[in-house]
Structure formats: C-alpha cells, structure tokens
Swiss-Prot record:
Required cofactor names: Zn(2+)
Comment on bound cofactor: Binds 1 zinc ion per subunit.
Listed HAMAP family: Pept_M48_protease_HtpX
Main location: membrane
InterPro entries: HtpX_protease, Pept_M48_protease_HtpX, Peptidase_M48
Keywords: Cell membrane, Hydrolase, Membrane, Metal-binding, Metalloprotease, Protease, Transmembrane, Transmembrane helix, Zinc
Annotated GO CC locations: plasma membrane
Record protein name field: Protease HtpX homolog
Annotated residues for binding of Zn(2+): 143, 147, 227
Upper taxonomic lineage: Bacteria, Bacillati, Bacillota, Bacilli, Lactobacillales
Catalytic residues, chain numbering: 144
EC number(s) given by UniProt: 3.4.24.-
Length: 299
C-alpha cells in the first residue's frame, strides 16, 4: 500500500508538470497570435522563458529562502536532540546531512529547502520543538527529509518558476493589448477574417486573462500531491505511522505562524502557516490534515 501510494503520487506530479508546460505553451500561443502573427513563435518564446525561470530558481541560494522565513542556522551544541534527529533521518534516507535551522515562532511547523540533497536545509519552529515528543518529531523531520530525498523541493521550485513565467507573459500580453493595439490593428487590413480568426482572438484573450489563475491552481495541486508523498515516505523511513499520525493531529490544532509568510514559502511548510478558512479545497496550499491522517491509517 505504501509503495503504491508513493508511485501514484509521483505519476500525478508528472502529469501536473506536463499540464503546467501545456498552460505555458497556451499563453505563449495566445500572445504570439495577437502580437507576432505566429502561434508557434509565441509558444517557443514562452517555453524558453519558462525554462530560464526554472533553471534560475533551481540555483537560487538556500540562504535567501531561510532569510525570508527568519530562520537561524544552529549547531549540534545548541540543540543536540533536534540536530541528531535530523542526522538520523538523513542517514536512514541515505542523503547528505542537511543544514539545520530554527525559526523563533510559537506555532508548530517545519519545512525543507534546497535544489538537491547536496545543498539542502531543514527548518523547524521553536513551538514544534517544544511540543512534539521524539516519535512525533521524527515523523515531522522524516517528512521534511523525504522532501529532500524525493527532490520535492526542486519540483516545487520549478512550479513556482513556471507560475511566475505564466504571470509575466500574461501581464505583458495584457499591457500590449491595452497600449499596443496588437493584432486588432493589423486585422483592419484583413476585413472579415472569418470565423477561425474570431475564435482564435477569443481564445487568446481568454488565455491572457485566465492563465495566471490556472497556473496558481496547478501550483497548489503540485504542492498538495507532494505533501501526501512526503507523509508516506516519512512512514517508510521511521516505520512508525502512529508517530506521524499523532504529529499531524497536533499540527491540526496549531495556530497560524506569528510572522508573515509569503505565498511562495507557504507551500514549503508541512502545515499551512496561514491557516486560511472558508475556502474550497481547490485553493488550499496543503491537503486537509484529516485526509492525510486517513491515508496514513490505511498503511
């Protein structure tokens, strides 16, 4: 059951990334049709921008992410119990020892970052370290180490980059639509144009307007799938599903983080740091904890 769940989540994430690139191609085609008279040319430019964004984000420094979240690096002498749990989980997962950080915040939360296991880091809040017992903390750290081992952070980073690329291209297209005249000006030379031109024009306008929203939804879906996979992988590392389940139950009762967390960082945490309510599951950065517990109970 555990390995089937891991394989299923990996397949779903691949599908979501394919959808992301299709969305990027669609918005590129829309802008290309309106301003370059070339669907293919617009698609090519959009995909190139997407790849540039993705690679630049992959090599972004871990220090920047930690600074954005007010995290402080610690040594084994400062917090030996926490440090040794990270060390143990990394050893079981057969990855290099990540750098270890702590966030001075009373809420219960943790996250991992880095483009690969070789330059990864783990951070936990002081609230988490104070409330969780060893088995529960092993479950949480196992979850974060699983993100590193499974290259989840790289996938999440690519998703952020592609969403940013879609938003950029859509913004450019929108500005050109308002200030440039675009194809509508050239279309005056082609009276009539036929139904195909009208359909393509409508498609292009809708793509420019709706693509950023669609990109955000795909990004959130990728984040949710990664959380399910990391939960399952943590149990694989600790061989203790009850420890992870009890940790999730405590996380469910946690308050939002005291310091402000930007939207890009929110998806990295094991628990939604903003604790938004009143929204449909479609707009959550994380799957409902009750669903995560239910899946672990089936292991």
């Amino acid at each position: 059951m555990l390995f089937n769940q891991i394989a299923s989540n990996k397949r779903k994430t691949i599908v979501l990334l394919i959808v992301f690139f299709m969305l990027l191609a669609a918005i590129g085609a829309a802008v290309g049709y309106l301003w370059l008279d070339s669907l293919v040319g617009g698609m090519a430019i959009a995909l190139i921008i997407g790849f540039i964004y993705a690679f630049s984000m992959i090599f972004q420094s871990t220090n920047i992410v930690m600074a954005m979240n007010n995290a402080k690096e610690i040594t084994v002498d400062e917090m030996p119990d926490y440090y040794h749990i990270v060390e143990d989980m990394a050893m079981v997962a057969q990855i290099p020892m990540p750098r270890v950080y702590v966030i001075d915040d009373p809420s219960l939360n943790a996250f991992a970052t880095g483009s690969s296991p070789q330059n990864a880091a783990v951070a936990a809040t002081t609230g988490l370290l104070a409330i969780m017992n060893r088995e529960e903390l092993e479950g949480v750290i196992g979850h974060e180490v699983s993100h590193i081992r499974n290259y989840d952070i790289r996938i999440s980073t690519i998703a952020v980059a592609l969403a940013s690329a879609v938003t950029l291209i859509s913004s450019i297209g929108g500005r050109m639509m308002w200030f440039g005249g675009g194809r509508s000006r050239r279309s005056n030379d082609n009276e009539g144009g036929g139904y195909l031109q009208i359909i393509l024009l409508i498609f292009s306008l809708l793509a420019i307007i709706l693509a950023p929203l669609a990109a955000s939804l795909v990004q959130l879906a990728i984040s949710r799938q990664r959380e399910y996979l990391a939960d399952a992988s943590s149990v694989e590392l600790t061989r203790n599903p009850q420890g992870m389940i009890r940790a999730l139950q405590k996380l469910e009762q946690s308050q939002p983080m005291a310091h402000s967390v930007d939207n890009a960082s929110a998806a990295l945490y094991i628990n939604d740091p903003k604790k938004k309510s009143g929204l449909k599951h479609l707009f959550y950065t994380h799957p409902p904890i009750a669903d995560r517990i239910r899946r672990l109970e089936q292991v």
